[in-house]
Amino acid sequence: MNCSTVSVRLAVAVIALATASFAAAPIAVAQKRPADLETLPPVPTNYTPPKTPWGDYDFSHTYTLDNLADARILFQRPKEYGTRVWVTDEEFARRMKAAEGSDSHFGVRGASTTGTKGLADWMRHSDFAKRTSLLVSPANGRLPPLTPQGQRLYETGRSSWVPGQAFDWVDDFDTWDRCITRGFPASMFPNRYNNGIRIFQSPGYIVIALEMLGTRVIPIGDAAHWPKPLESWMGNSRAHWEGKTLVIETTNIKSGDSATHDPFKRAASPVIVTMVGGAPLDTTPTSPEARTVERLTMTGPNTIMDELTYSDPETYTAPWTAREEWTRDDSYKFYEYACHEGDVQVRNYIVASRAERAKVARGEKPATDNLARFTTDFDHDPGVGAPPPAARPTASNGKEGAGG
């Protein structure tokens, strides 16, 4: 859902989640920055977690991705960094200055929060704060090109993030617009709010509960994946242990695209615009061949390193891999993510879009469309310097709905 919608729908749910949670967040164990800033060291495995009574390593805590989001360590690497995995001291100093400024403006005002609390402290203690992006492969830290078929479906897809998009029915919106799902693996990456992750374990199972839309119940062992025709929004996951690392393989992710008008053939985008540094438009298709391999490793008593590789040969020309650090914070509170309840946005978009087109047909001046800024990178990493000037809204072509 676009920014104006989020502010209406989720104001209460956002209270003290993305920022105040830093107050009690434990300090991470650092993965040291090497001298060669293009080198990506392997995930450290020297820490040995305690075990559950049945012998599995115990990951069962509450974690948050807020640090990554608020520090603006983007999913896709800013082009200024090139193939560097790590920032320089000068670039890190700019990030630190921004974090200290954000912490200094922390406050709670009514149904919202401002600033952050404890962000600069996390950055001082975790070398992940010196990373240039979550994406580590391809080497440039950017998503690989789409295949011709993937590009065609991407360009013809529909969502509330598409400039000039007309809205006539619910199939003109993506799955997150409609509070169904953020998609997979998009649900596993930092968003602008509600970044909590809670792990539960029992013999033979691990449960990954996401604060925003989704709980994954994952068998551990050699159980077979579902047969091919069966699919779900979060896919079908199976896990096994490789030493101290939990490896989760996910297949059977709901396939489809956002260009079709058949609601049963719609699918979520694997990477979405509101991921911090994600991909524009929320219209990337998902084929039946899509799969992920996640490797979860506790690198210290208060951190998990999650390495996720996504492959979909019908959509992307190459697989891509991201790493992210989960910070343990057992005091982090999950609040109900009430998205459908009281939701009037989809109806309002449709009504406003029809009214706008009728107005233009009468020869009246069209409204401005401010969605063009979401078609390219719009998140800003303070490490690269001052942000570029904001683009000014342009007149719509008469197709614009309420998103403008």
Predicted segment positions?
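PEST-like low-complexity, intrinsically disordered acidic/proline/serine-rich tracts
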Residues: 2-3, 12, 22-404
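Sec-dependent N-terminal signal peptides
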Residues: 9-15
